[in-house]
């Protein structure tokens, strides 16, 4: 029962061939069996889950259900939900029970979706491997010696391991797409401002965006229909007419112009990644898509620009964790200043401290112009590159990551780890939508994904193209043993 896609489970629930309680119980049993080794979930509450499932069954019986009623979903530990621990995988919030619910979570609860639990992540969403979690690293379900990616590593792992049909992630510099690629599932980062950030713990406010993760592009489109929309509680939320993100699912690939950025196909990619890209290019050609070489010359500037800007925003956002109102507080201190210092030293992990220090430095007097303002200018150049490319093509095909998932504990420096986000970060700098979908496997049997990047508000076009690719391939149907 846990092998169904979201769409398949929806059909079975609506036709009353299975009940929401049966489906939730099957997932809870699978979680109890497999999660101790996987560590994809860090908070489970069977009683709450089954209560939501019973309520969903009542809605279905009364005939007022939506397509998502009764479907279980996992939430990255960055989303607040009343009565659930929302720790952001940090010691700082280990004892924080949220008094309110994130807008995007509330939207899915209103649809009748059933909460399975909170998934593991890099602390405060800072990381690319899930090794920065206070609760220990989640494992890659394809090979437990390897990372699932990050920061939404737990969400990617539980969907790939069939411990949830869908999950929510957040994407600040690639945190939905990179782990989805490493775990062999589909995930989309929408246009910045499409999905409300209210109740999603802030890392870098001008980058953060929530999105769905599932087995297929069709599942992601169904979820995005429920998630998107204006929210007056989020000042960055965009007021736009409601869209149907499933509208292009049946649009053929014939005539679609796909840009291939020459800077993304270079020596930095493993042979396995280049093979996966070539497989996708061959499929697109066979389906009648037109392939055009484009250039994104400022890509090389995206990593330094991103880590200056995101760290600056993080140092500001994380200043609220001071031990006064909520969260961890040091046990022993002699005055207020010592309490602040000890609380933050004990509560934050090393990567979070590193980014706070970088951010505080680049915002400090004498360095603001040299680093922060310069990075803002580079951000504009990166965004302009994409607009030049989209004048010639509808979508851009790119690698999601330069290689398959590395081993847990691989001796990479922070800079080497940051460089693994080279293909995802530019999209966040520009605020564009992008989706990753499975496109092959490495010689070691680990999944490899490719990215489809679109212009602003082209989610339906991206999801349609991805769905057509998935109709003509089976990478998304493969699952770990």
UniProtKB/Swiss-Prot annotation:
Gene3D superfamilies, per the entry: Amidase signature (AS) domain (3.90.1300.10)
Transmembrane regions: none
Domain of life of the native organism: Bacteria
Catalytic activity of the protein: L-glutamyl-tRNA(Gln) + L-glutamine + ATP + H2O = L-glutaminyl-tRNA(Gln) + L-glutamate + ADP + phosphate + H(+)
Biological process, per Gene Ontology: translation
InterPro entries to which the protein is assigned, alphabetical: Amidase, Amidase_CS, Amidase_dom, AS_sf, GatA
E.C. numbers: 6.3.5.7
Catalytic residues, chain numbering: 76, 151, 175
Quaternary structure and interacting proteins, as annotated: Heterotrimer of A, B and C subunits.
Annotated family: Belongs to the amidase family. GatA subfamily.
Protein name per the record: Glutamyl-tRNA(Gln) amidotransferase subunit A
Species this chain originates from: Neisseria meningitidis serogroup A / serotype 4A (strain DSM 15465 / Z2491)
Gene encoding the protein: gatA
């Amino acid at each position: 029962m846990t092998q169904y896609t979201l769409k398949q489970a929806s059909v079975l629930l609506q036709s009353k061939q299975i009940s929401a309680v049966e489906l939730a119980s099957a997932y809870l049993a699978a979680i109890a069996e497999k999660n101790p080794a996987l560590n994809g979930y860090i908070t489970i509450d069977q009683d709450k889950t089954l209560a939501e499932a019973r309520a969903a069954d009542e809605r279905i019986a009364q005939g007022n259900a939506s397509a998502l009623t009764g479907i279980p979903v996992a939430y990255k530990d960055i989303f607040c939900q009343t009565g659930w621990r929302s720790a952001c995988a940090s010691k700082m919030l280990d004892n924080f029970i949220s008094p309110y619910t994130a807008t995007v979570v509330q939207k899915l609860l209103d649809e009748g979706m059933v909460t399975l639990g909170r998934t593991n992540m890099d602390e405060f969403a800072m990381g690319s491997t899930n090794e920065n979690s206070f609760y220990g690293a989640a494992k890659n379900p394809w090979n437990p010696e390897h990372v699932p990616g990050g920061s939404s590593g737990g969400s990617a792992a539980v969907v790939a391991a069939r411990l949830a049909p869908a999950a929510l992630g957040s994407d600040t510099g690639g945190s939905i797409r990179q782990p989805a690629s490493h775990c062999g599932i589909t995930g989309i980062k929408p246009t910045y401002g499409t999905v409300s950030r209210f109740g999603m713990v802030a890392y870098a406010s001008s980058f953060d965006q929530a999105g769905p993760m599932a087995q297929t592009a069709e599942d992601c489109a169904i979820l995005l229909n429920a998630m998107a929309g204006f929210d007056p509680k989020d000042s960055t939320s965009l007021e736009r007419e409601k869209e149907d993100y499933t509208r292009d699912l049946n649009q053929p690939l014939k005539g679609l112009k796909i840009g291939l950025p020459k800077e993304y196909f270079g020596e930095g990619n493993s042979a396995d990644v280049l093979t996966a890209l070539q497989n996708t290019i061959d499929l697109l050609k066979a389906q009648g898509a037109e392939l055009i070489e484009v250039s994104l010359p400022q890509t090389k500037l995206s990593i330094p620009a991103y880590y200056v800007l995101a760290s600056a925003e993080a140092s500001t956002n994380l200043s609220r964790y001071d031990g006064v109102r909520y969260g961890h507080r040091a046990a022993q201190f002699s005055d207020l200043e010592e309490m602040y210092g000890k609380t933050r030293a004990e509560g934050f992990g090393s990567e979070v401290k590193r980014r706070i220090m970088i951010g505080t430095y680049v915002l400090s007097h004498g360095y603001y112009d040299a680093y922060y303002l310069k990075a803002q200018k580079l951000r504009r150049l990166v965004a302009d590159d994409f607009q030049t490319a989209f004048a010639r093509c509808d979508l851009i095909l790119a690698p999601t990551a330069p290689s398959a998932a590395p081993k847990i504990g691989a001796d990479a420096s922070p800079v080497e780890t940051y460089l693994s986000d080279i293909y995802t970060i530019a999209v966040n700098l520009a605020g564009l939508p992008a989706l990753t979908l499975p496109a092959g496997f490495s010689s070691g049997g680990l999944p490899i994904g490719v990215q489809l990047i679109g212009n602003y508000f082209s989610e339906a076009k991206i999801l349609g193209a991805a769905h057509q690719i998935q109709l003509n391939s089976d990478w998304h149907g493969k699952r770990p043993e």
